[in-house]
């Protein structure tokens, strides 16, 4: 059913089953543990050798992102009510919440005691330097930060944290890797899953990817993250076609109204929904 159900759903009536009239895409396995096939059939023809995919070098150079400092994640604030992205367990839709933000030295800050984390989206394809900033509730993160380049649909960098310096470390490590998923705490990268192919795919064997996946999930839990499948949720925070409140590199988006909205709900506070990064080096091509 794992192969038949999606084939039926997408109307691919010739795929998904081993039966007369179906395309013979078949793996013959010696057991259900190792999953190393003895025979591979593609459209009925035996495959003697699985060809190695040659990835063009330009596909591995998609992080057109300047270095940022913690200043790039500062949110000027005078107090008042703010829009907050609210996570819903088991859903990729988000709620549009209203809450008071913590205030330090004229800047809005994360408040892990109230499960309020900062979220940032950094444009990474064109080198524009745009950063959209906001706040999110529901991950449960108590320290550090985590982020990824797997972020539907634009696949910009998205990072969540309660420590601006840790957020900077996550972004810098993602830039060095050429994309992926990174978890950091204080001044240390705790776990990472490199995705160097367009920042979306791994070029490593499945076993290595599985080990790295377990590592990033364990590291996220060590930061206090309680939301189930946090990296899957992270990948949908910037999906600007799914209700209700999302974050993009241009700022917060009210999907229901289909318009960018400021973080603040108070008219007397002037705050841009997004602003350029603070560059300290040339664009990384």
Language-model-detected regions and their locations in the chain:
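Active-site microenvironment of metallo-dependent hydrolases
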Residues: 2-285
């Amino acid at each position: 059913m794992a192969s038949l159900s999606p084939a039926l759903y997408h109307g691919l009536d010739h795929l998904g089953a081993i039966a007369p009239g179906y395309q013979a895409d078949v793996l013959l396995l010696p057991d259900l543990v190792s999953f190393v096939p003895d025979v591979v059939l593609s459209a009925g023809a035996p495959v003697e050798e699985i060809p190695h995919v040659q990835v063009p070098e330009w596909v591995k150079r998609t992080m057109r992102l300047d270095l940022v400092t913690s200043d790039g994640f500062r949110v000027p604030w005078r107090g008042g009510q703010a829009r907050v992205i609210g996570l819903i367990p088991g859903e990729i839709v988000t709620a549009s919440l209203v809450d008071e933000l913590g205030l330090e030295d004229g800047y809005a800050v994360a408040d892990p005691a109230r499960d309020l984390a900062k979220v940032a989206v950094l444009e990474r394809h064109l080198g524009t330097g745009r950063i959209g900033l906001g706040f999110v509730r529901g991950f449960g993160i108590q320290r550090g930060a985590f982020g990824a380049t797997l972020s539907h649909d634009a696949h910009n960098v998205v990072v969540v944290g309660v420590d601006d310096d840790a957020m900077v470390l996550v972004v810098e490590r993602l830039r060095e890797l050429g994309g992926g998923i990174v978890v950091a705490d204080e001044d240390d990268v705790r776990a990472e899953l490199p995705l160097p192919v367009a920042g979306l795919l791994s070029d490593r064997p499945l076993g290595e990817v599985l080990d790295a996946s377990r590592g990033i999930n364990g590291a996220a839990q060590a930061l206090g993250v309680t939301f189930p499948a946090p990296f899957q949720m992270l990948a949908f925070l910037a999906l600007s076609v799914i209700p209700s409140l999302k974050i993009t590199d241009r700022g917060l988006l009210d999907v229901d109204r289909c318009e960018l909205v400021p973080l603040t709900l108070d008219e007397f506070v002037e705050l841009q929904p997004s602003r350029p990064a603070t560059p300290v080096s040339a664009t990384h091509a």
